[in-house]
């Protein structure tokens, strides 16, 4: 997907500065022995077989970006695709989608509290936007 390696590093560095252990995770086939080693905690959950982008402590985060040009529906799609991979999502909001619109997209897609955290990547940094059912 369109998230660059530089953005992954910036996002990983943000969590590392908070004292978290961060690991960029590779894409591996579910039947390979590496999958169980890397993503073992996902086995038996709705995310089994998925390969989120980053592990922060014991949480797996999925980064969602977009291909230009920016359109409103892209933030909806980023949330929808992100929640298919992990309940912890980082959205590329470099084009400055409004908080109101992103909030509405989360509420519409947060069935059974499937979304635990949403971070927004803006201006080279991360901002916590949603956590455990509450907007920040």
Each predicted region: which residue ranges?
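Conserved catalytic cores of phosphodiester-cleaving nucleases, focusing on short active-site segments
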Residues: 54-67
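Metal-dependent nuclease catalytic core centered on acidic motifs
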Residues: 1-40, 45, 66-136
């Amino acid at each position: 997907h369109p998230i660059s390696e530089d953005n992954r590093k910036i996002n990983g560095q943000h969590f590392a500065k908070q004292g978290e252990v961060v690991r960029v995770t590779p894409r591996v086939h579910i039947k390979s022995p590496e999958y169980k080693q890397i993503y073992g905690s996902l086995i038996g959950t709705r995310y089994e077989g998925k390969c989120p982008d980053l592990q922060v402590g014991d949480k797996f985060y999925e980064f969602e970006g977009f291909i230009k040009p920016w359109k409103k529906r892209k933030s909806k799609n980023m949330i929808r695709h992100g929640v298919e991979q992990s309940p912890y999502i980082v959205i590329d909001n470099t084009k400055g989608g409004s908080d109101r619109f992103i909030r509405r997209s989360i509420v519409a897609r947060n069935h059974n509290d499937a979304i635990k955290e949403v971070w927004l990547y803006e201006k080279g940094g991360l901002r916590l936007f949603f956590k455990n059912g509450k907007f920040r």
